[in-house]
Amino acid sequence: MKKVKLGEVLSLKKGKKATVLAEQTTLSQRYIQIDDLRNNNNLKFTESLNMTEALPDDILIAWDGANAGTVGYGLSGAVGSTITVLKKNERYKEKIISDYLGVFLESKSQYLREHSTGATIPHLNKNILLDLQLELLGIEEQENIICILNTIKRLITKRKLQLDELNLLVKSRFNEMFGDPLNNNKKFAV
């Protein structure tokens, strides 16, 4: 298998601070911050101009702060100042699937955190990131890896939901058997 340094594959562009809007307007676009790399629970928007733009094919990585190394992909919009956009160079656009690159970087996030700089606020080390070696697999192999990993992620999510429901069932059975422990409605001796 051929390996390639990320520095050959990617170019980096740092995000910018913007005025944040809670509601979307006709002139606004999505404003992506660190929380958005994990989920879409709290969408924010901006009308600020001259922003760093992310396209769905780009990889986003939290560059600064306690969450440095957190990775997101498949997002589009204006990018906040603590995030860097990783764009595939022309030579590799058709050779590397963004999801494959994204899961590779997710697997390296702890390593990137451990090698970050800054005494009080961690910052990713650009050289460490760009020196990472990516295995250059065929498109079909990349798609297969993504399919398997997505299946695993779905199963993990389902299992977590099952455990949450089981925890609620245990609490419910406890209350049914012994009553509410706060008001002791079953009059147990304390």
Question: Where are each of the predicted segments found?
Answer:
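Residue-level recognition of specific faces of alpha-helices
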Residues: T82, T120-H123, I148, E165
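Sequence-specific dsDNA recognition surfaces
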Residues: V4-I59, V190
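A short beta-sheet element
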Residues: Q33-L37, N50-E106
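Histidine kinase transmitter module recognition
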Residues: N89, F104, L155-K158, Q162
